[in-house]
């Protein structure tokens, strides 16, 4: 089921997501979640997907082999840092999984099969990054679809929508901004953020594992406008 609504149809005190839920309910579609398709223009486009079930679960050490495989897949590796073998992956993600680091790590599933991973964190907990991106009050997130067969099928938009709406926003009470910063050459990632209603802001240089810098594009999602008004 496809849902389209113009921005003028969004009510006062109502986010785009809430407006889409209202339209879906009026049409009698309440059995499946309403997902973003493309919020970059007007009308806003959503859908109810009867073909896929999207879910997230906490990452565990048992997921490390999949993470290693995903970050070495060509479409991911070109944007990834040096943490590409099992030892480095365990060193990098282990503190978060043990509760020693406030970053939360998740595995994405489509129809019960693991396809990638994502993370969320308070940017203020990472002072050096907060200084670079100038968004200390925002909630940061990063994401990877590791399975090449799942790329360029519109699934990334749906997966991120479920992640941000159902897990990130409820976990950070009062958060008004969600923030991600892909490499400026990563047009695929920039486009998926645009489809989620993100706006591009500051370009800044972020140190990379090779001792140089990567120029990234700060992208912000206004929580009240896009996901949850109250």
Predicted regions and their residues:
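Helix-loop element at the rim of GNAT/NAT acetyltransferase active sites that forms part
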Residues: 69-83
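A short beta-loop-alpha structural element at the N-terminal edge
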Residues: 54-69
């Amino acid at each position: 089921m496809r849902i389209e609504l113009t921005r003028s149809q969004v009510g006062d005190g109502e986010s785009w997501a809430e407006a889409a839920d209202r339209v879906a309910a009026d049409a009698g579609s309440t059995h499946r979640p309403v997902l973003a398709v493309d919020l970059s223009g007007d009308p806003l486009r959503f859908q109810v997907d009867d073909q896929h079930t999207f879910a997230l679960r906490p990452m565990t050490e048992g997921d490390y082999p999949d993470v290693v495989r995903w970050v070495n897949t060509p479409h991911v590796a070109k944007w990834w840092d040096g943490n590409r073998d099992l030892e480095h992956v365990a060193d990098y993600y282990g503190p978060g999984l043990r509760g020693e680091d406030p970053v939360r790590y998740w595995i994405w599933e489509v129809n019960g099969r693991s396809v990638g991973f994502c993370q969320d964190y308070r940017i203020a907990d990472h002072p050096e990054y907060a200084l670079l991106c100038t968004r200390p009050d925002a909630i940061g997130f990063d994401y990877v679809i590791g399975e090449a067969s799942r790329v360029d099928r519109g699934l990334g938009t749906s997966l991120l929508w479920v992640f941000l709406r159902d897990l990130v926003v409820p976990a950070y009470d009062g958060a008004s901004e969600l923030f991600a910063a892909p490499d400026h050459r990563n047009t695929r990632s920039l486009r998926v953020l645009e489809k989620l209603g993100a706006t591009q802001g500051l370009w800044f240089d972020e140190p990379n594992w090779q001792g140089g810098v990567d120029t990234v594009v700060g992208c912000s999602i206004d929580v009240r406008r896009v996901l949850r008004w109250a």
